[in-house]
């Protein structure tokens, strides 16, 4: 039986139960609010983070795990006889995967580092598939890598930003453009493509957001195998989207998750995202 350890980072949004069930090692990105650093695993819940973020004038800062954290994890599991498959969010959004690559070069053993091209549950799709195959003990790292690449190629991720405040604070939207967008009640819908967030469209009401997003589901030519929803205090949109998506897709379960603080930092209050993969 092969011993393969799956390692990922916290932006995948795995629950503690998922990580425990599938024996996945999660390395945490941290967030800094008003000079204080928080580890989302031990120091602050996603809900508490949203409250703190609303209270601060400055955009919280996120930091990738230190290279030393990767080295420590890689040394631990290679010493126990594991091969390692380390799956991380797109390098277009964070330097996490590059830190993992540097650490892998410093540790002897069979360590494969993967840029999954996604984040949030789009990343989790690949991580959970890898962990399921690793736990079976019948597959090589190469076979698992090929399987998650297949899921990657069949995945789509969309995010709805209902307030431009955090994008303005982060310098991603000009202040005048953001001010006008707020006046016009503009909601931004973006798509993650090849690891890069790109504008899909802009609409002017939550009703039009819901209509547009549901049309994306309706117009998907292939059968949707898994559809997950993530929100940052965006339950109104998320709940309506889930209810109607069940009717469209025939899926009986569409899981809903609270966004990881790193994701919420950039998406802002009220955001929600949905991601799926097809057959």
From Swiss-Prot:
UniProt GO MF annotations: lipid binding
Statement: the UniProt record of this protein carries the keyword Translocase: no
UniProt entry tagged with the keyword Zinc: no
PROSITE patterns referenced in this protein's UniProt entry, alphabetically: DEGV
InterPro entries: DegV, DegV_C, DegV_domain_contain
Gene3D superfamilies reported in the protein's UniProt record: 3.30.1180.10, 3.40.50.10170
Amino-acid positions noted as binding hexadecanoate in the UniProt annotation, renumbered to this chain: 62, 94
Domain of life per record: Bacteria
Keywords: Lipid-binding
Domain DegV: 4-278
Protein name as catalogued: DegV domain-containing protein lin1977
């Amino acid at each position: 039986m092969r011993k393969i350890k799956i390692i990922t980072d916290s932006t995948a949004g795995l629950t503690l139960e998922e990580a425990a069930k599938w024996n996945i090692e999660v390395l945490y990105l941290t967030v800094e609010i008003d000079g204080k650093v928080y580890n989302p695993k031990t120091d602050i819940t996603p809900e508490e983070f949203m409250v703190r973020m609303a209270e601060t004038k400055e955009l919280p800062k996120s930091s990738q795990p230190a290279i030393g954290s990767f080295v420590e994890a890689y040394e631990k599991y290679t010493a126990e006889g594991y091969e390692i498959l380390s799956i991380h969010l797109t390098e277009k959004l964070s330097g996490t995967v590059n830190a993992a690559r540097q650490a892998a070069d410093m540790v002897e053993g069979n360590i494969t580092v993967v840029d999954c091209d996604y984040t949030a549950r789009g990343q989790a799709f690949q991580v959970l598939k890898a962990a399921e195959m690793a736990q079976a003990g019948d597959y090589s790292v190469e076979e698992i890598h090929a399987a998650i690449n297949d899921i990657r190629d069949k995945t789509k991720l969309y995010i709805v930003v209902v307030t431009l405040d955090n994008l303005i604070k982060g310098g991603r939207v000009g202040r005048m453009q953001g001010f006008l967008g707020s006046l016009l009640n503009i909601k931004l819908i973006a798509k993650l493509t090849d690891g890069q967030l790109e504008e899909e469209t802009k609409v002017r009401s939550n009703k039009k957001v819901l209509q547009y997003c549901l049309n994306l589901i309706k117009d998907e030519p292939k059968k949707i195998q898994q559809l997950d929803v993530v929100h940052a205090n965006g339950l109104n949109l998320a709940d309506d989207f889930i209810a109607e998506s069940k009717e469209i897709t025939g899926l009986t379960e569409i899981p809903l998750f609270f966004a990881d603080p790193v994701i919420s930092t950039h998406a802002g209050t009220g955001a929600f995202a949905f991601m799926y993969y097809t057959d």
